[in-house]
Amino acid sequence: MTLWSGRFDTEPDPAAFDFGVSFGFDRALFEDDVTGSLAWAEALGACGVLAKEDAAAIRKGLESILEDGRRDPAFITGADEDIHSFVERKLIERVGDAGRRLHTGRSRNEQVSLDLRLYLRRRIPLLQQALAQLITAFADQAEAAADALMPSYTHLRRAQPVLVAHFFLAHASALRRDFEKLEAARVETDALPLGSGAIAGTGYPIDTALLARRLGFSRVVRNSIDASSDRDFVASFLFGVSMAMVHLSRIAEDFIIFTGEEYGFFELADASATGSSMMPQKKNPDPLELVRGKSGRAIGRLTGWLATMKALPSGYNKDLQEDKEAVFDAERTLASSLTAAHAVVSRLTLRATNAADAASGLLLATDVADYLTIRGMPFRRAHEIVGAMVRRLIAEGRDFSTLTLKEWKEASDFFGDDAPQAATALESVYAKRTPQSTNPDAVHASLRECRDWLDSLNPKSQIPNRKSQ
């Protein structure tokens, strides 16, 4: 028997019923469903809707169900329609008619919204912890790189010299934005929907403010119609996950390229690579490639969910059942991808000579133009002169390091005797002046700030930093 069988003369068609069953995946909400029901029973008792003995029996029954489910996941099984039906069935089996009173004044429409909010509230911090661990790995690599140099790239063409540490901290910076996006999604879940009923509210004098405090919510939803269909918090979570996966995909792409033989700036650890069944020499970046591939999966969950939401009329619709599979899959995808990325990044070896060699040559052209500009030449004119120098050097198979002082001065009388010494990768990074630049002092300050940010998380989330590892 279903929770809604009273209206119907016949049993549901098995195919139609099975099509709507969600217990196969929403059992993940077991703990949240029981937690919400415990609070609801308490609220019903507090306003006199439940007799004290019934409230006590329900509480005892739900606590025993929760204990059994935590002890043995196989306990959470059956032919039930959804997790709500399962919990109610188990409760009635244990406490009889008192269990049939639990759903007084409550709809599954608000119940499932509550469950999913509770679920995300406890699961988002775990994803944030994994993000912080990866950020820590990048900070550790930045510290280990010290003042090593590498080329930066635009259009996948060498652009300007940067510190390797600056490159690592660039990825840490993007991941910190992902941490904040997930925090924004967590804040968005922080509203109690109970008291909304199916759509119009409940006729029982439930103290929703007290109920919100009991469940750890900072506020109650504003409108019962909106609450019954609101899954904006799901979209926000999926967006946060998708952006994190986009950044992980870009990280993966960078290291797939930079660990390849043609670049060789970094070496993958044997423990975070795979081989070939045919080619003995191969060392493949499979974990990185899978992270890159799974980003499309997460993005698909976001776009699919937005497409589901876009045409729904006001109030609850069964389409909203699709939210849970999107959430669960996106969460698993990000969690596993963060674990894999951490395994790779934390074990990377810098091949400093290869990286430094690639950071010299013609990518110093901007610094040469800046040299002229600092000495009074308009930048656009300096750009033209240096461009002509580059054209000549390419034709001759040379770079700036091969120019004699005479050749420098022939290119422009703005070049002084110090021009050859100024056109080096090390001078290039020291010439930068802004706080977000690759200047070594700026990078060291950025690393300290990143460490401070990570340390600030520890009291709340137990996120490890280098001191505790």
Question: Which residue stretches match the model-derived regions?
Answer:
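A helix-coil-helix interface module used to build multimeric assemblies
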Residues: 1-201, 206-208, 274-275, 290, ...
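Generic, well-ordered alpha-helical scaffold segments in large soluble proteins
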Residues: 40, 61-68, 90, 94, ...
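Charged, flexible cofactor/metal-binding loops and thiol motifs
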Residues: 116-124, 129, 143, 151, ...
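Glycine-rich cofactor/substrate-binding loops
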Residues: 1-32, 36, 97-98, 264, ...
